[in-house]
Amino acid sequence: MVSSWRVQQAAREVKAGAVIAYPTEAVWGLGCDPWNEDAVYRLLALKSRPVDKGLILIADNIRQFDFLFEDFPQDWIDRMSATWPGPNTWLVPHQDLLPEWVTGQHDTVALRVSDHPQVRELCALVGPLISTSCNPAGRPAAKSRLRVEQYFHNELDMVLGGALGGRKNPSLIRDLATGEVVRPG
């Protein structure tokens, strides 16, 4: 396990506009502050990912997403709460409360409360975080720090070392309003 001071250093970097790599439940992730437009566009450029596709936000606990849930039915909140923390990503209406560089051309945003200890510690310090697989578009997601370095060599501000969470597949993605599975887990 990476020492807490490294996670604190990563939090300082993110707050300063950094793009970082870190281990998640199944693959390495790239992340940054969702409110920092320059950081998000830099992350998108590193991945060669179009902004219109949208990005996932991860958090330490469901309360970090409360600003989005004000008008949600209680059963929606209960449904998400029953699956978090864990490998479940929900597409929820963003109600124009998030910037376009996060949501892309969608009326929904993807949210997950991670169960990876380092990710949770980092999000507890910085709030919700952009999280996307650590790979250039069209390449397999990094499953090792070596692959992270091969993909992005000196282009990242920080690589937070640590172990993956042991899951074989990325998270399940479901639409909160319809229950439809968008991506199997």
UniProtKB/Swiss-Prot annotation:
<dbReference type="GO" id="GO:0000049">
    <property type="term" value="F:tRNA binding"/>
</dbReference>
<keyword id="KW-0547">Nucleotide-binding</keyword>
<keyword id="KW-0819">tRNA processing</keyword>
<dbReference type="InterPro" id="IPR017945">
    <property type="entry name" value="DHBP_synth_RibB-like_a/b_dom"/>
</dbReference>
<keyword id="KW-0808">Transferase</keyword>
<comment type="function">
    <text>Required for the formation of a threonylcarbamoyl group on adenosine at position 37 (t(6)A37) in tRNAs that read codons beginning with adenine. Catalyzes the conversion of L-threonine, HCO(3)(-)/CO(2) and ATP to give threonylcarbamoyl-AMP (TC-AMP) as the acyladenylate intermediate, with the release of diphosphate.</text>
</comment>
<dbReference type="InterPro" id="IPR023535">
    <property type="entry name" value="TC-AMP_synthase"/>
</dbReference>
<protein>
    <recommendedName>
        <fullName>Threonylcarbamoyl-AMP synthase</fullName>
        <ecNumber>2.7.7.87</ecNumber>
    </recommendedName>
</protein>
<keyword id="KW-0963">Cytoplasm</keyword>
<dbReference type="GO" id="GO:0003725">
    <property type="term" value="F:double-stranded RNA binding"/>
</dbReference>
<dbReference type="GO" id="GO:0006450">
    <property type="term" value="P:regulation of translational fidelity"/>
</dbReference>
<feature type="domain" description="YrdC-like">
    <location>
        <begin position="4"/>
        <end position="185"/>
    </location>
</feature>
<dbReference type="GO" id="GO:0002949">
    <property type="term" value="P:tRNA threonylcarbamoyladenosine modification"/>
</dbReference>
<comment type="similarity">
    <text>Belongs to the SUA5 family. TsaC subfamily.</text>
</comment>
<keyword id="KW-0548">Nucleotidyltransferase</keyword>
<dbReference type="Pfam" id="PF01300">
    <property type="entry name" value="Sua5_yciO_yrdC"/>
</dbReference>
<keyword id="KW-0067">ATP-binding</keyword>
<dbReference type="InterPro" id="IPR050156">
    <property type="entry name" value="TC-AMP_synthase_SUA5"/>
</dbReference>
<dbReference type="GO" id="GO:0061710">
    <property type="term" value="F:L-threonylcarbamoyladenylate synthase"/>
</dbReference>
<dbReference type="InterPro" id="IPR006070">
    <property type="entry name" value="Sua5-like_dom"/>
</dbReference>
<dbReference type="GO" id="GO:0005524">
    <property type="term" value="F:ATP binding"/>
</dbReference>
<dbReference type="GO" id="GO:0005737">
    <property type="term" value="C:cytoplasm"/>
</dbReference>
